[in-house]
């Protein structure tokens, strides 16, 4: 029998589901921060058999050319809520799915490309969730001739998403890429209804 998602997982999903923008930050510091949009669009519950999302990150001036796309599966585990991260085969076919539900509906389950070692672990802390990459420094990303591991820190509230991603050299642990000016501060422009388990599941 399938275990129903926890209340914390459903709350995390509800807060994640939306269209986020760092417009205020970009206007206040235009030489430092570009105006970025982040979409977390809920997937049908049947896609993963649990709560899941499609995401894309794109510059506000070109919503049809995301520079980051992913699929995300939310799971209750000991120690927190795990968000497994996946790439998409032929991701360009689904560009724009963050703001176009018709494109979202075309994403097949067989396009998943697991990102090993790249799960995010979230824990509830009062009126927010804090997340970071699973331990081990195994989320590897090639960049500028180096193999780097991802260090990602996220704080999520009902209306905000604050994130800082950095790539660290595997050997020296010095920063190779990512923001030098601090985290990106996003505010939710629009919320989306999160995916819910079908009636009769759980127990």
UniProtKB/Swiss-Prot annotation:
Any matching Pfam family: CpeT
UniProt-listed Enzyme Commission number(s): 4.-.-.-
Molecular function in Gene Ontology: lyase activity
Enzyme class: lyase
Disulfide bonds: none
InterPro entries given in the database record: CpcT/CpeT, CpcT/CpeT_sf
Keyword Lyase found: yes
Keywords: Lyase
Coiled coil location: none
Superkingdom as given in the UniProt entry: Bacteria
Function: Covalently attaches a chromophore to Cys residue(s) of phycobiliproteins.
Family, per entry: Belongs to the CpcT/CpeT biliprotein lyase family.
Name used for this protein in its record: Chromophore lyase CpcT/CpeT 3
Organism: Gloeobacter violaceus (strain ATCC 29082 / PCC 7421)
